[in-house]
Structures are given as C-alpha cells and as structure tokens.
Swiss-Prot record:
One cellular component (GO) term of this entry: cytosolic large ribosomal subunit
Keyword tags: Ribonucleoprotein, Ribosomal protein, RNA-binding, rRNA-binding
Described purpose of this protein according to its UniProt entry: One of the primary rRNA binding proteins, it binds directly near the 3'-end of the 23S rRNA, where it nucleates assembly of the 50S subunit.
Origin: domain of life: Bacteria
GO molecular function, one term: rRNA binding
GO biological process: translation
Subunit structure: Part of the 50S ribosomal subunit. Forms a cluster with proteins L14 and L19.
UniProt xrefs under HAMAP family: Ribosomal_uL3_B
InterPro entries in alphabetical order: Ribosomal_uL3, Ribosomal_uL3_bac/org-type, Ribosomal_uL3_CS, Transl_B-barrel_sf
Record's protein name: Large ribosomal subunit protein uL3
Disulfide bonds: none
Name of encoding gene: rplC
Pfam families noted in UniProt: Ribosomal_L3
Amino acid sequence: MSETEIKGILGTKLGMTQIFDEDNRVIPVTVVEAGPCVVTQIRTVETDGYNAIQIAYGEIDPRKANKPAAGHFKKAGVTPRRHVAEIRMDDVSGYELGQDVTVEIFEGINFVDVTGTTKGKGYAGAMKRHGFAGQGAAHGNQAAHRRVGGIGACATPGRVFKGTRMAGRMGSDRVTTQNLKVQKIDADANLILIKGAIPGVRGGIVTVKTAVKGGAHA
C-alpha cells in the first residue's frame, strides 16, 4: 500500500482521443469529466469505525429525489445529486459538509486507479466469455465445436462445482484498472486526461482515485 493520501472523485467517461507529448509522440488518452462533486457525509473512526468521505455527483431535479435521499442531502446543505460514492482515507480533518471536490485534487498526482462498469456483451458462450479453445473440428464431432465439454465428474462428487466456467452473461462487471498515468488536467473544464483505456462505455460513471500501488507520485 502506498503512503500517498487517498483522494477520489466521481466523473463521466467522455471518450478517447490522442495528444502529443514534448517529443511529438502520439499518446492515446481517455477524457474524463471529473466532478465537481460535493461532500455529503463525513465518517470518522469515533462514530463509524473508519475514516471516509461521501461525495455526490450529477445534478438532478430535486422533485425526483425520494424522501430519505432528500433528507440526507438537506442535512448536508446541498441540492440532491444523482450519484453517491464513499472514499476511504486516513484523515478527513480537511473536509466539511457541502465542500466542493474538484479535479484540482489530482494536481501533482502522476498515477490513478479508475473504477467503472465494463461494457455488457449479453449472453456469451464459453469460447468468447472465457477464451476456451473449443473442440476438435472433425473426427466425429457433431455440432459441439464451440461447446464447453466436461463440467465435472460423475457420481463423485455428483454435482457441478460453483464457479465452473460456462456460458452466461458477459460484461457489466465492476472493474478497476490500476496505475494509469495522468497526462493532463484542465481544471477550468473539469477534465482529466488519462493515458490508455478505462472501463466502461462513453457516458458511463467512473471513480478516479490516487493509485494505491506503486506510488501515485512515482
């Protein structure tokens, strides 16, 4: 675990583009509209057993918030938001309810972890879903070329073990990609440019945090 203070923000994946570095090399980047978020709750060791802040992102019509959510946001002194996330950290003394959290928190940070929901692929077979090689193309194979094959033993244990890799729903998983390089921050436009690809579809909600491995300032 890195000793770097953990910071995080919610944002929207806008898509990918490319920029040029000082040596005129092309760098593929993902553009994320990060924040602005607002602090809606502060958790401490004394009251909750751990330190964390809850941040909210995305304006909504206040009339569309249910009563529990409306009351929660009212207590924080902010208007209702669409998305809420909790960021654990060692010290929350620098935060207060209603405080804005912007992309500027990543100034000086070189590496981040990005969490998002991957693209849904629908119902997929074992070859596409798990990379199975498939069965032989000839020698008596009848319409089973892409099937799984054996999924267990016979009378012992007499069942299929949980987690056996078979066909099923593929994608729509919560995934974190670690140690992505921060190429550029545009505080005026609330944008952060991250080298490479990140999980999710264009327009998907992502969480950007300082990298927990390898050192965010490396």
